Regions:
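Intrinsic-disorder-associated, low-complexity terminal segments enriched in Asp/Asn/His/Tyr and depleted
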Residues: 2, 11, 19-21, 34, ...
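Short, positively charged and aromatic/hydrophobic N-terminal segments
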Residues: 14, 18-21, 25-32, 37, ...
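N-terminal entrance/gating region of PLP-dependent enzymes' catalytic architecture
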Residues: 43, 60, 71-220, 517-518, ...
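PLP-dependent enzyme catalytic core of the Aspartate aminotransferase-like
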Residues: 50, 529-571
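Conserved PLP-enzyme active-site core in the AAT-like
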Residues: 198, 232-405
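Active-site C-terminal subdomain of aminotransferase-like
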Residues: 327, 371-477
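Short beta-strand
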Residues: 481-486, 524-528
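Conserved PLP-binding catalytic core of the aspartate aminotransferase-like
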Residues: 482-516
Length: 571
C-alpha cells in the first residue's frame, strides 16, 4: 500500500515552478459541453498530477460507477439581506464612506491627545448603534456605519496629531493601512504557504533584506513573524531552553532531576514580557537573575559577572541572557558586543529584545547603537513601532535556522508535512505558536517594495534628532530636570518648580500626567526612573516639532502651578 501510494503521488519538487500571471483568465462558459467519461485514477494521476483535466474540469470521483457530477445543494438562502451583506457593490459603497472619513482624519493636524470617555458612557453609545433585530438579518444602515467609524476615531489616541508624544506605537504610513485593509478582506492566514502564497514569499524577502543589516550568514539564519514582541520573546526563550535542556519538551521538569534549576539573566529595565514568558515556561521569579545597570541604564558587564557567579552558587543554571536594544523606560541600548563576549564565555544563549530599537539598524547614521548584533543568537524586532506599520507586526530572527525549530517539537499531520517540498519549505507553522496568523508582513513589505529603506531611515533619524533637540531645550529650563541623555527617541524628565517638597516629587509628576491626559490636548506617558515617577515622551510622529514640545512644557507648567496653588490652599 505504501508503494502504491508513493507511485500515485507526484514528486512536487520536480514540478516546474509556477509563474504568477496577473491577468485573470476568462472562465469557461457554463454551457460548454462536459464529458461524463471518467479517467481511471492511475491514468488521471499520471497524466496530470495537479488533478485538473485539460479542459479545466475536475472529475468528481474516481470510483467505479460513481456519478459524473457532484451533488447539488438542496438548501436555499431565504434572506436576500444575507446575500447583500456580501455584495461587492455594497462593499465599494461602504469602503468609500470609511475612506472619506479616514482621509479627513489624516488631514487634521490640530493639536489633540486623547478624548478620555467614561467606559459606561461609551458602552451606552456603542449599544445604541446596535440593531435590535434578533431573528432576521438587519438591512445595512450607512448612517450607523458612519457613526461607528466616527466613534472609533474620536475615542482613540490621536497618533497622527502633533499632540501625540506618549507611546511606542505610531501613526502608520497610510499605504500600510491600505494593504492591511486588503489583508482583512482576502483573509489569507499566513502560517502555511498554500494558504497565503505572497505573504510567505514577502516574509522570506523581508528576512533577507533586514538580515543584510544584522549581518548573519545569508544561508544560515531564519526569521518568523509573530503577533507582538511578547510572543516573540516567549518563543525565543523556549528555543533557548530546549537547546540548553533537550529533554525538557518531552519529559518536562522531570528531565532536570539532580541538576541546577534553569534560570535566565536580564537587565533590571527589561520589558515585563520577559518575566512573564519565564513564568509561562515554569521559571519562577526567583530564577530570574537581575543584572545591575550603569548610569546610562545599560547592563553593566563588569558588575554582571559576580552576580552570575552568585546565581550559580545558589543552585541556578543560567542558560539565557536577555539584553535590550531600546528599553521601554528610557530607550537605553545594552552593550551588545560586550554582552556577546560574556555570553560566549559562559555558554549562554544571548537574546536581544529589540522590539523598539532594532529598527535603527536600517539607518546608516544610527546603526552603531546595535554594535555587536551579529553575535547574538536571537532578536525580537517590532515593525509596528519604528517601522510605522499596523500592529501587530513582530519579526523574530535566529542566527541559526536549525535552532528556530527548537521552540516546538510536535507532529500534526493535518498541517505539518513530513516530507517538505519547495512550497512547504516556506511554512512557518512549526516555528511559532500561531496556526491562524495574520499576514502581518504585507504592509511592511509593500512599503519597502514601493518606497525602499530610505522612507524608514529618514523618519527614524528625524525622530531621534528631534529627541536630542528637546533634551537640549530641557537642559536650558531651570525648573525641569532631565534624567538621561536620549539614545534614540525616548526621553524622561521631571517638572520641579521652586518650593516643591522632595517628598512630593513622585505624586506631583503622576498628577501632572493625569491632568494633561484628561485635558486632551497632549498625550504623554509616565514611568518610574530610580523608583520615582517621571514624565516620558516618545517621539513617534514626524509632524511634531520643537515648537510643539515648547507648547507642551507650557501646559506642564500651567498644570503644575495650578496644582501647587491648590495644595497650598488645602494645607
Amino acid at each position: 500500500l505504501d508503494q502504491a501510494c508513493r507511485a500515485l503521488s507526484p514528486d512536487l519538487s520536480r514540478l516546474p515552478r509556477q509563474h504568477l500571471d496577473i491577468a485573470v483568465p476568462t472562465p469557461p462558459c457554463p454551457d460548454a459541453p462536459h464529458s461524463s467519461e471518467e479517467i481511471p485514477l492511475t491514468e488521471y494521476r499520471s497524466e496530470n498530477p495537479f488533478g485538473v483535466r485539460s479542459d479545466g474540469t475536475e472529475p468528481f470521483s474516481a470510483q467505479a460507477g460513481a456519478t459524473s457530477s457532484p451533488p447539488r445543494a438542496t438548501g436555499t438562502l431565504e434572506s436576500g439581506l444575507l446575500l447583500e451583506a456580501f455584495d461587492a457593490q455594497l462593499f465599494r459603497e461602504q469602503s468609500e464612506t470609511v475612506v472619506a472619513k479616514l482621509e479627513k482624519h489624516l488631514a487634521d493636524l490640530s493639536i489633540r491627545g486623547l478624548d478620555l470617555t467614561d467606559p459606561a458612557i461609551l458602552t451606552d453609545a456603542a449599544r445604541a448603534l446596535m440593531t435590535t433585530e434578533r431573528e432576521q438579518v438587519a438591512a445595512f444602515d450607512e448612517s450607523k456605519l458612519a457613526a461607528i467609524v466616527d466613534l472609533y476615531i474620536k475615542t482613540g489616541i490621536q497618533v497622527h496629531s502633533p499632540g501625540y508624544m506618549g507611546r511606542q506605537f505610531s501613526g502608520v504610513v497610510p499605504l500600510s493601512g491600505v494593504i492591511d485593509f486588503v489583508s482583512s478582506v482576502v483573509n489569507q492566514p499566513s502560517s502555511f504557504y498554500e494558504a497565503a502564497q505572497l505573504p510567505n514569499v514577502a516574509e522570506r524577502i523581508m528576512a533577507e533584506e533586514l538580515n543584510a543589516f544584522i549581518g548573519w550568514d545569508p544561508g544560515s539564519f531564519a526569521m518568523v513573524t509573530t503577533s507582538g514582541g511578547s510572543l516573540a520573546n516567549l518563543t525565543a526563550l523556549l528555543s533557548a531552553r530546549n537547546h540548553a535542556f533537550p529533554g525538557y519538551w518531552s519529559e518536562g521538569a522531570l528531565s532536570l532531576t539532580g541538576q541546577l534549576r534553569p534560570a535566565i539573566a536580564v537587565g533590571d529595565d527589561v520589558h515585563y514580557s520577559v518575566a512573564r514568558a519565564a513564568g509561562v515556561m515554569g521559571i519562577g521569579d526567583a530564577q530570574i537573575v537581575r543584572l545591575p545597570l550603569n548610569e546610562r541604564h545599560q547592563i553593566c558587564v563588569e558588575r554582571a559577572r559576580p552576580v552570575l557567579d552568585a546565581a550559580e552558587r545558589q543552585g541556578l543554571n543560567v542558560f539565557c541572557l536577555v539584553a535590550s536594544a531600546g528599553t521601554t523606560p528610557v530607550g537605553a541600548f545594552d552593550p551588545l558586543d560586550e554582552l556577546a563576549g560574556l555570553a560566549r564565555e559562559r555558554g549562554l544563549w544571548l537574546h536581544v529584545d529589540g522590539a523598539h530599537g532594532a529598527s535603527l539598524l536600517v539607518s546608516d547614521e544610527l546603526r552603531h547603537k546595535l554594535r555587536g548584533i551579529e553575535k547574538v543568537d536571537s532578536l525580537t524586532w517590532d515593525a509596528h513601532k519604528m517601522m510605522f506599520t499596523p500592529a501587530p507586526c513582530t519579526l523574530l530572527f535566529y542566527r541559526n535556522k536549525e535552532k528556530s525549530l527548537g521552540a516546538f517539537r510536535q507532529q500534526a499531520s493535518y498541517v505539518f508535512d513530513e516530507e517538505p517540498d519547495i512550497y512547504t519549505a516556506l511554512d512557518s507553522g512549526e516555528k511559532n505558536f500561531e496556526c491562524t496568523k495574520r499576514p502581518m508582513i504585507m504592509p511592511l513589505w509593500t512599503l519597502w517594495a514601493i518606497h525602499g529603506r530610505a522612507l524608514f531611515a529618514q523618519k527614524i533619524e528625524y525622530l531621534c534628532r528631534l529627541t536630542g533637540d528637546v533634551h537640549r531645550i530641557l537642559e536650558g529650563e531651570p525648573d525641569f530636570e532631565t534624567l538621561h541623555r536620549p539614545e534614540a527617541n525616548i526621553l524622561c524628565f521631571r517638572y520641579r518648580p521652586a518650593g516643591l517638597p522632595e517628598a512630593d516629587v513622585h505624586d506631583f509628576q503622576v498628577e501632572i500626567r493625569n491632568r494633561i491626559k484628561f485635558e486632551g490636548n497632549f498625550f504623554i506617558s509616565k514611568v518610574n526612573v530610580d523608583e520615582v515617577a517621571a514624565l516620558r515622551v516618545v517621539m513617534m510622529n514626524h509632524q511634531v516639532t520643537t515648537e510643539h514640545f515648547r507648547m507642551l512644557l507650557g501646559e506642564i507648567r500651567r498644570v503644575g502651578q495650578d496644582l501647587l496653588r491648590r495644595t497650598r490652599r488645602i494645607s
